[in-house]
């Protein structure tokens, strides 16, 4: 009996020492610049698991944290071979950016400067719509893609819904997986990801003309319809300026321009109720040297409660762009000029997409 007890005690001590060593490893690596952390992935399997774990990624100290998000611009470049700009879906979530070029999806971490191409999406169609989500529980990023038909087939719903998983503690197959979708719909807006759930606006119904809000649970990979919207009200947006989905005070909102510099926000209170906010910024735009026909897009709101606008178009050769902040309570605008120096890159740049909730990520690609 005594020998058995001693063995048990030694085992417990050995386990305690292992846990201490893991804590030491984490503290050592956290003190290093992120660009040097990747070198330690090859030290051992244990070190690799620690560095790639959601706990380490969340605890890594950064300048740009969720406490004070920063402004990030993503750039879309010119296709030199074809002589025109590539059509690209650009999504940001939890420190990473996803660029969707049809069947090709590129993931990049602005903090590390590293990027990876995912395996090509297998599809009978070359028209691919992509979205990007994050599950904070398992620390996994997922790309959701679906196929579409163009031209005379706008009333045909999307098909071939596929998912690719990045990161997390769970081992997953590094390939695209088909998922089931029983809701006939066709995506119409960008997406927002909140608390592990991805939302996007879409058309549904027999003729694909009825507005709805779709939801993709990043963890369970389940697609369903959250809410249907009043079709007659939504159809009044300004021609050529499609609605966009934004985060508004922790809720999902559909933002669209009814006329130049006049906007509506449809905020989802629950599945059955949407509240409408209508406002105009025409009265102040000229104070900031803006032309009457300068078009701005609602891109979200920040911690102060202000709504953020960014230009639809930006000529990067001027080396600057503008951001407008609007306070609904005080009916006041403030204007910010963002200067940048792209050097020799500017002839290749087509689109600048702003993200106002950027935080850094220690995710190593």
UniProtKB/Swiss-Prot annotation:
Pfam family, one: FBA_3
Annotated InterPro entries: F-box-assoc_dom_typ3, F-box-assoc_interact_dom, F-box-like_dom_sf, F-box_dom, Gal_Oxase/kelch_b-propeller
Recorded superkingdom: Eukaryota
Domain F-box: 15-62
PANTHER family: BNAA05G37150D PROTEIN-RELATED (PTHR31111), F-BOX ASSOCIATED DOMAIN-CONTAINING PROTEIN (PTHR31111:SF138)
Protein name: Putative F-box protein At1g31000
Organism: Arabidopsis thaliana
């Amino acid at each position: 009996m005594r020998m058995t007890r001693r063995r048990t005690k030694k085992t417990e001590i050995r386990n305690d020492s292992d846990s201490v060593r893991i804590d030491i490893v984490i503290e050592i690596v956290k003190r290093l610049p992120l660009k040097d952390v990747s070198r330690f992935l090859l030290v051992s399997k244990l070190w690799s698991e620690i560095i790639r774990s959601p706990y380490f990624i969340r605890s890594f100290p950064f300048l740009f944290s969720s406490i004070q998000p920063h402004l990030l611009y993503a750039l879309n470049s010119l296709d030199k071979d074809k002589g025109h700009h590539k059509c690209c879906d650009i999504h940001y979530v939890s420190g990473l950016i996803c660029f969707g070029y049809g069947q090709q999806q590129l993931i990049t971490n602005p903090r590390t400067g590293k990027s990876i191409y995912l395996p090509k999406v297998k599809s009978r169609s070359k028209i691919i719509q992509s979205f990007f989500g994050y599950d904070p529980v398992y620390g996994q990023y997922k790309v959701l893609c679906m196929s579409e038909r163009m031209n005379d087939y706008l009333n045909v719903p999307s098909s071939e819904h596929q998912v690719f998983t990045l990161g997390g503690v769970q081992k997953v197959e590094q390939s695209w997986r088909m998922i089931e979708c029983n809701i006939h719909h066709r995506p119409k807006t960008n997406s927002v990801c909140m608390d592990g759930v991805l939302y996007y606006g879409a058309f549904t119904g027999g003729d694909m003309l009825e507005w709805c809000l779709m939801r993709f649970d990043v963890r369970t990979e389940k697609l369903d319809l959250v809410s249907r919207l009043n079709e007659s009200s939504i159809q009044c947006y300004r021609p050529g300026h499609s609605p966009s989905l934004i985060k508004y005070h922790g809720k999902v909102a559909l933002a669209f321009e009814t006329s130049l510099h006049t906007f509506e926000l449809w905020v989802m209170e629950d599945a059955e109720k949407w509240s409408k906010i209508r406002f105009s910024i025409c009265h102040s735009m000229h104070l900031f040297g803006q032309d009457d026909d300068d078009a701005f897009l609602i891109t979200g709101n920040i911690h102060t409660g202000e709504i953020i606008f960014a230009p639809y178009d930006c000529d990067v050769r001027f080396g600057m762009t503008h951001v407008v902040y609007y306070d609904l309570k005080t009916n006041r605008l403030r204007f910010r000029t963002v200067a940048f120096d792209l050097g020799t890159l500017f002839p290749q740049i087509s689109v600048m997409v702003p993200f106002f909730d950027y935080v850094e990520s220690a995710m190593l690609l």
